Amino acid sequence: MSNTIKMVVGLGNPGKEYEQTRHNAGFWFLDELAWKWKASFKEEKKFFGEVARATLPDGDVWLLKPTTFMNRSGQAVAALAQFYKIKPEEILVVHDELDIPCGRIKFKLGGGNGGHNGLKDIQAKLGTADYYRLRLGIGHPGDRNLVVGYVLNKPSTEHRRQIDDAVAKSLQAIPDILAGKCEEATRFLHSK
């Protein structure tokens, strides 16, 4: 049996100044997944990002951290997907989510972009919203005028711990997600 998911994308912004910001929660997840799978990232200019190939029992899975900045993430996702003939429904995008309390997780196929610029660009470049999303809750600052500053700043120690716990829990669901057991993964991820 082959993997249902052939590419896992972590969203974030490149550069040291953004490494520890909330908007990079997708990168944090991908770094942990690569470590778990013993896969190493290397810069791939033709894919506009850092790419790692994980060789798993049921087939290869590509890991991608776009280096295009968040609002152009679709350029990297589309380039890798087209080159390796990966369909949108074989892609899992992991990203920060303002509309979910800090430390909570949501998993789904398709849907809107919720104002997330990375998702907007991915949808535009793929021509569809029918890809999987793993949404890591970072909480909301309470005022939409504070959103940009909020996502581009470091979380408090307590919030970082909650996000790290969400990343750890999400990693436990990856085998089910890869195997196409999405109901099981959803039940596990959505539980407290």
Swiss-Prot record:
InterPro entries (alphabetical): Pept_tRNA_hydro (IPR001328), Pept_tRNA_hydro_CS (IPR018171), Pept_tRNA_hydro_sf (IPR036416)
One Pfam family linked to the record: Pept_tRNA_hydro
Catalytic activity: an N-acyl-L-alpha-aminoacyl-tRNA + H2O = an N-acyl-L-amino acid + a tRNA + H(+)
GO CC, alphabetical: cytoplasm
A Gene Ontology BP annotation from the UniProt entry: rescue of stalled ribosome
Site (Discriminates between blocked and unblocked aminoacyl-tRNA): 13
Binding site for tRNA: 18, 69, 71, 117
Chief location category: cytoplasm
Signal peptide: none
Gene3D superfamilies xrefs: Peptidyl-tRNA hydrolase (3.40.50.1470)
GO molecular function: peptidyl-tRNA hydrolase activity; tRNA binding
Keywords: Cytoplasm, Hydrolase, RNA-binding, tRNA-binding
Positions annotated as active site in the UniProt record: 23 (proton acceptor)
Residues with site note (Stabilizes the basic form of H active site to accept a proton): 96
Compartment(s) of residence: Cytoplasm
EC identifiers of the protein: 3.1.1.29
Family to which this protein belongs: Belongs to the PTH family.
Quaternary state and interactors: Monomer.
Job of this protein: Hydrolyzes ribosome-free peptidyl-tRNAs (with 1 or more amino acids incorporated), which drop off the ribosome during protein synthesis, or as a result of ribosome stalling. Catalyzes the release of premature peptidyl moieties from peptidyl-tRNA molecules trapped in stalled 50S ribosomal subunits, and thus maintains levels of free tRNAs and 50S ribosomes.
This protein's name: Peptidyl-tRNA hydrolase
Source species taxonomy: Bacteria, Pseudomonadati, Pseudomonadota, Betaproteobacteria, Neisseriales
